[in-house]
Amino acid sequence: MTTKVTQQYHAKIYVTLRPSVLDPAGTAVQSGLGHLGYDNVAQVRIGKYIELNVTADTLAAAEAQVDRMCDQLLANTVIENYRFDLTPVTEPTATGAQR
């Protein structure tokens, strides 16, 4: 029997509007900050921050899986860009039959 080793990774995903896309939420926040006396704030952009854990055989496999998640659901790639960081959260775990 073979033993399969897996690793759990923690993903921090940052989704932001593309620079060419207007950001009405950012404009509203910037205006609100100005009304509160923060006149030195400019270029406010609002985005999304997502955290999740994924189990994979390798770091490359985890990266590919998170990349697909972002492309398919977590980001609207027509108007948003994304980037992510992955860090291991557990020691690798062996699964399967052992002799």
Please tell me what each predicted stretch does.
Residues 1-99:
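Long, contiguous binding/interaction regions
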